[in-house]
Amino acid sequence: DKPLLDTARDFVIIVVFSLVLFFILRFLISIKRRNKRKQLHLLLGPSEKQFLDFLRLNYRQGYVSGHQIVAFFGKHKSSPESQRQFRAKLIEGLNKSLGLIFPGEQVLDIQADDKDQRMLTYRLTDSMYQALKNL
C-alpha cells in the first residue's frame, strides 16, 4: 500500500485538475454565449430588436396578434396592405437573422387566430425562448 501522504497528494491533484477543467469549461461556454449575443446585436435591425423584445415580454401571456404588433410599432393608422407588408418584412427579417444564429431552430410558432381565421397569431417557440433567455 501507498503511504498516506502519497494518497492525499493524489487526491489533491485530482481535485485541482477537476476544478481547473470546470473553470475552463465555464469560460468556453461564456465565450460562446457572448459571441451569440454579439451576433444577435449585429444581425438584428432596430425594428427586429424591438419585435424580439415584444415577443419575449409577451411570451408568458401567449400569442400576440398581428393587430398588437402593428399597434406596438405605431403603424395602426397605415393602410391594411402596408400593415401586412410591414408585418411580413418584420417577421421575415427576424426569422432570417435568428435562423443564422440558431441554425435548424424554428423561430416562431404561428397559428390562426381563434376569433378571426384570416389573422395569424405569433409566439416564440419554447426552444427559441429558452435559447434567448440563456444568452
Predicted regions located by residue number:
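A generic alpha-helix signature
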Residues: P46, Q85-K89
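DNA-binding patch around the recognition helix
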Residues: K2-V15, L21-I29, L40, L55-N58, ...
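Short acidic (Asp/Glu) and glycine-rich catalytic loops that position anionic groups and cofactors
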Residues: K32
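Short, positively charged loop/turn segments that connect secondary-structure elements
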Residues: K75-F86
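Secondary-structure boundary/capping signal
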Residues: Y63, K77-S79, F102, Q106
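Short amphipathic alpha-helical recognition elements used for nucleic-acid or partner binding
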Residues: H41-K77, L94
